[in-house]
Amino acid sequence: METDPKEPSAIVWLNTELFGPLPLPADPALRTDTEAILARARALASRSKATETHRSYLTSWEQWCAFCKLMGYQPLGGDATAVGMFLAHLSLTKSLATARTRLAAVATAHRIAGVALDTKAGPIANVLEGFKREQGIKPLKQATPLLVEVLKRLLGIYTKDTPANRRDKALLLIGFASALRRSEIVALDVEDVESVPQGVVLRLLRSKTDQQGKGELIAIHRGTDSEFCAVTALERWIEVRGRKPGPLFTRLHKGGRMTGERLRPQAVALVLKRAALASGLNSGSFSGHSLRAGLATSAALAGADLKDIMAQTRHRSHDIALRYIRRAEIWKDNVTKLLFSPPAIDEPHG
């Protein structure tokens, strides 16, 4: 706990890992609780949020503070109107999902500091409802799903047997087959891979939907085509990487020497875009999320049930999972096939 040297009687600062220094409003009643609040803040920072969420909350907090400075609001003032204004500002350039993340971060910061903020108050709820209705009219751009046929085309560029090609091929196939988020892919360690007769089991220690770190298991079957088999690609990468404990997917020096440094989440998109470009495809339409979306959409096209798709993607919400398979659904029993590709009619003989 520190005071602002410029205004020692006005502001008390809480140093937190999740948000950095938090300025408490000038309320003497709050200061008697600062030690307890600080302890709570440390506990929340160390246990409550996964690393990717931590980064997202920190970014959200920085943007909220910048907005408050511009508009003359207190970041921890508990002002629902100010938060509503912030959400309205975000609606100009951001998605509803991003706005909800920003709101969750601001609410968490208030809770850590012991300041009441009613996120269901009219100024917040009404803006969110309007935001939701507006984006229902203007659909958001979603990641282009990387379908099986396209993935096979991308894998065709890895003709040379190099450490980088082995790593990148395994990264794409494992990312696709596991339906992991990009942050989850690069968070895997060698120790999280278990070989079994059917294929491999990946142990995901923490994820977006498992903030408490209970862990989840993801199964990947061995394929019949070794060139399009995530298990084979992973085994070939581990052959050159070795089984020394540590990050599964690592950076490489020029020439293929191992660095031991974990890839960053952004590397997933870079590998995918590089492969798309080399395959003559529009690399700009793909993102790291295309692997996850591609598994869900490809499985739906192959006739998989929604519950089985959700088991692999680990979605809790049917509505969110359905977003990924709508592309498959629009082709099911589509009438234009009857009009433009009618079934052949046998000509009568004789």
What are these regions (language model features)?
Residues 1-350:
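Extended, non-catalytic subsegments within catalytic or DNA/protein-binding/adaptor domains
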